[in-house]
Amino acid sequence: MFDIGFTELIVIGIVALVVVGPERLPKVARAAGHLYGRMQRYVSTVRSDISREMQLDEMRRVGQDFKQSVESAASGVEQQASVVDDYLRGEVDMLDKSVRNEPQNAQTPPQTADAEPAQPDVRQQTLPLEEPDQNRAAGEPSSTSTRPA
């Protein structure tokens, strides 16, 4: 803090001895030591406060930068969402128009001269029906029946 060498300290001690006197010199030296300690604590407190404020300012700047980047990303996402929304609305409108026009086209199907009228499929699907087996009725076990426990 102070650049005081050994010789300068001896000169200060001799001057203090002459000015204060030998009886009061220990009390004055003790008081000067206490004042010097208080001054050092005060200086260290001020340094730590300044350091803390600088860190706080830096954190505020980082927070503001982060907030700006998040806001810009959010606005970009909102822009993309509005573009997609506009595109989807256009597609829905186009599909709506095509669905509205389709019933009109379905009411008047195109007639062709060579086209045969469509005949419904009248074939009936036959399912095989099995006659009950006489052996099963007599009590013989089959491979598909369950055995009693």
Swiss-Prot record:
Region (Disordered): 92-149
Keywords, ordered alphabetically: Cell inner membrane, Cell membrane, Membrane, Protein transport, Translocation, Transmembrane, Transmembrane helix, Transport
Transmembrane parts of this sequence: 1-21
The keyword Iron appears for this protein: no
GO MF: protein transmembrane transporter activity
Subcellular location: Cell inner membrane
Biased composition (Polar residues): 101-111
GO cellular component labels: TAT protein transport complex
Gene3D superfamilies per the UniProt record, alphabetical: 1.20.5.3310
BP GO terms, sorted: protein transport by the Tat complex
UniProt key word Endoplasmic reticulum: no
Membrane topology summary: Single-pass membrane protein
Quaternary context: The Tat system comprises two distinct complexes: a TatABC complex, containing multiple copies of TatA, TatB and TatC subunits, and a separate TatA complex, containing only TatA subunits. Substrates initially bind to the TatABC complex, which probably triggers association of the separate TatA complex to form the active translocon.
Family: Belongs to the TatB family.
PANTHER family named among the record's database cross-references: SEC-INDEPENDENT PROTEIN TRANSLOCASE PROTEIN TATA, CHLOROPLASTIC (PTHR33162:SF1)
Main function: Part of the twin-arginine translocation (Tat) system that transports large folded proteins containing a characteristic twin-arginine motif in their signal peptide across membranes. Together with TatC, TatB is part of a receptor directly interacting with Tat signal peptides. TatB may form an oligomeric binding site that transiently accommodates folded Tat precursor proteins before their translocation.
Designated name of the protein: Sec-independent protein translocase protein TatB
